[in-house]
């Protein structure tokens, strides 16, 4: 009833979830147990979410079927291979690692460690790592090499001959590769461009859609919530 009351007074879903956690902590401190994951409470939360339509308000996640369509469209473009390998690597790395778009463009050559199992990428700093302690994301080889982020990135590194500095760079004068790092806005524009080319309305998607798509797809596959959050860097379950 308390959550419903807050909801009718305009509280957001993120606020309701924080309040629920706080209530659970207070009960614990007083020696009482409150199961915040009790079916009745979960049903109440889901009912509020449906009424608010909170899922529809945000940008949509790019799920695996759309991810494959994007990669197929990139491969079919009448562009130089070097451009296609850059763009497909951005998309595949961004999705498979649950990266924020600013994390994608911040990757340097020295952050990459190709290992027999796949690829380790060092993240020197992120939105939720304000002290710059850094962490590592590990990406395995995929069975289907066409959609494998590790295979794609290897080809991009080889064709671009990048051996230091930013991994994802701008092109100047056609297909000439510069030393300048891409901006995170460029990642968002690339996503929208290829969605449109695939016949998918891009207005409901953003640069965040790769990361949320990874989290959603992993959850639907049965991956534990804390494992997903460790990969994406989420501090809460609010996508």
Map each language-model feature to its residues:
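Extended, non-catalytic subsegments within catalytic or DNA/protein-binding/adaptor domains
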Residues: 1-239
């Amino acid at each position: 009833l308390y959550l419903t009351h807050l909801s009718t007074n305009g509280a957001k879903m993120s606020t309701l979830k924080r309040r629920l956690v706080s209530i659970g902590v207070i009960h614990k401190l007083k020696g009482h147990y409150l199961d915040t994951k009790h079916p009745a409470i979960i049903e109440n939360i889901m009912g509020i979410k449906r009424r608010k339509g909170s899922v529809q308000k945000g940008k949509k996640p790019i799920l695996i079927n759309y991810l494959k369509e994007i990669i197929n469209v990139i491969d079919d473009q009448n562009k130089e291979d070097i451009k296609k390998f850059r763009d497909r690597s951005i998309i595949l790395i961004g999705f498979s690692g649950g990266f924020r778009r600013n994390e994608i463009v911040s990757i340097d050559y020295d952050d990459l460690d190709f290992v027999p199992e796949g690829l380790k990428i060092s993240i020197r700093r992120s939105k939720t790592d304000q002290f710059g302690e850094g962490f590592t994301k590990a990406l395995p080889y995929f069975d289907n090499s066409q959609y494998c982020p590790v295979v794609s990135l290897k080809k991009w590194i080889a064709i671009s001959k990048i051996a230091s500095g930013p991994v994802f760079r701008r092109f100047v004068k056609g297909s000439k590769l510069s030393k300048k790092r891409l901006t995170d806005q460029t990642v968002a524009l690339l996503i929208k461009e290829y969605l449109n080319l695939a016949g998918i309305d891009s207005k409901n998607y953003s640069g965040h859609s790769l990361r949320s798509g990874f989290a959603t797809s992993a959850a639907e596959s049965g991956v534990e919530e804390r494992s997903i959050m460790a990969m994406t860097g989420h501090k809460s379950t609010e996508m």
